[in-house]
Regions:
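A short secondary-structure junction signal
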Residues: 60-62, 72-78, 102-104, 133-137
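Outer membrane beta-barrel
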Residues: 1-71, 79-98, 117, 125-127, ...
């Protein structure tokens, strides 16, 4: 079965715990990985989700195309508009011993107490084709520079804005059994298309970094 969504929702392209709603977290705030590599986790776009079984193995694929500019990506006024390109990505969750109990997957705890050990192994990847935010979940606003937004310029076309491509890959492992819950997450990020980039519009201050990770 397939489910299609269009609008603003939790994106599947982040680490697993960023799929949890705030009221379903195990602790009072999100973990450091989520805080450093995501913002709200909500994006605007088209989302396709499915789930099926291969024998006793559960498979849950998800795909997404978003604006690449995070929540409220159309901006609050004419000076706060979308910039850069779209973000493309997806997620694949595998349940080797079958799905968790209904309603127990996207919880930080094992509130429903899985009677047998249940495991989720997940991976996600996304490519933001023109990012203007440090984690690819926001868009440039000169009033929000201290919140991670930025604007680069092309050295070959003076005054023309230039945005790097931002790649993010995640790996997740979740185990739940009789009230015990364990989550391991890994993330790797990199930025590309940073050659011939300037930090100011008259191209006198050059960016000397070719990869950020």
């Amino acid at each position: 079965n397939f489910h299609f969504y269009f609008g603003q929702k939790m994106t599947p392209m982040n680490n697993l715990s960023m799929q949890y709603m705030e009221n379903n977290l195990q602790f009072s705030s999100r973990n450091y990985l989520s805080q450093n590599f995501s913002t709200t986790g909500r994006e605007f776009g088209l989302f396709v989700e499915s789930n099926f079984e291969l024998g006793k193995i559960g498979v849950e694929p998800k795909l997404a195309i978003t604006s690449g500019d995070g929540m409220n990506s159309f901006g609050e006024n004419s000076l706060d508009a979308d910039v850069g390109g779209f973000k493309y990505g997806g997620r694949l969750n595998i349940y080797p011993f079958g799905y968790f109990k209904k309603g127990n997957t996207y919880l930080g705890h094992d509130l429903l107490r899985e009677e047998k050990p249940k495991i989720l192994v997940g991976a996600s990847s996304s490519l933001n084709m023109g990012a203007s935010h440090k984690v690819g979940e926001g868009h440039y606003n000169e009033d929000l520079l201290n919140e991670g937004t930025f604007l680069f310029y092309d050295t070959d076309s003076i005054g023309l804005a230039r945005f790097p491509n931002y790649l993010k890959n995640n790996l997740d492992f979740c185990l739940k059994y009789k009230g015990f819950s364990m989550l391991i997450e890994y993330v790797n990020t990199a930025a590309y298309n940073l050659q011939s980039v300037a930090l100011n519009n008259n191209a006198t201050v050059l960016l000397d970094t070719t990869q950020i990770s």
